[in-house]
A protein has these predicted regions:
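Sigma70-family region 2
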Residues: 45-46, 82-100, 119-120
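A short pre-motif secondary-structure segment
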Residues: 158-162
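Amphipathic, Lys/Arg- and hydrophobic-enriched alpha-helical face
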Residues: 56-74, 91, 148, 197-200
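Arg/Lys-rich amphipathic alpha helix in sigma70-family domain 2
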Residues: 93-97, 106-126
Length: 201
């Protein structure tokens, strides 16, 4: 899977360069993240760029995977992630609950993805196969790839957050500004639709 080589943020003359090959990936058990962001969020709110870089390293892969799965373009995914991180870096001082960092930055990402998707629909020119290379997604199952492609953009976003990154229905609801019961119901319908399509019934 293609990844962004780096994301560079400029803010009041400070520069953060976070390279993808040195990322410290956050692991989770049962969909519950085990990292406590509190200390670094407090430092980042005070202008500590190194603390923000550490926060970035813990969420980058989640951000990129969700953006790529939703937008189906590595270039656009990198752009959306870069915009998300820039916004987060410049507004982290407004984040009151340190433990809410992950959900907060995912909300920013969700808004950026939706904006990019609106740009797609506004553009009447169709994208070529070269602009959407299937190998970026690493789908071994062609039928699954095609079934996911037929989902609407919001369904792909919800599915990616659940299946790829392990977010719970409540977490997805909070990030996307939806009702938790609606998210769980929609996830169930999405999975059932994929199951039926793949089984040929």
């Amino acid at each position: 899977m293609a990844v962004c080589a780096y994301s560079q943020i400029l803010y009041h003359g400070a520069t953060i360069s976070a390279f993808s090959d040195t990322l410290l990936v956050n692991r989770f058990k049962g969909g519950i993240r085990m990292n406590d962001f509190s200390t670094d969020v407090k430092l980042a709110r005070g202008g500590d760029s190194a603390a923000f870089a550490r926060l970035y390293s813990l969420v980058y892969k989640d951000l990129y995977h969700i953006a790529l799965y939703s937008l189906r373009s590595s270039h656009d995914a990198c752009d959306v992630v870069s915009d998300t991180v820039l916004d987060a870096f410049t507004t982290i001082g407004k984040l009151k609950d340190e433990k809410a960092f992950r959900g907060w930055i995912m909300k920013i990402l969700s808004a950026k993805i939706k904006r990019k998707q609106r740009e797609y629909f506004a553009n009447t020119a169709e994208l070529t196969d070269e602009e959407l290379p299937e190998e970026e997604f690493g789908y071994e199952n062609v039928e699954l790839h095609e079934a996911v492609e037929r989902l609407d953009p919001q369904s792909r976003l919800i599915l990616s957050m659940s299946a790829l990154e392990g977010y719970t229905g409540d977490e997805i609801a909070q990030i996307c500004g939806m009702n938790a019961a609606t998210v769980r119901s929609r996830l169930s319908r999405i999975k059932e639709r994929l199951r039926l399509e793949l089984s040929g019934t």
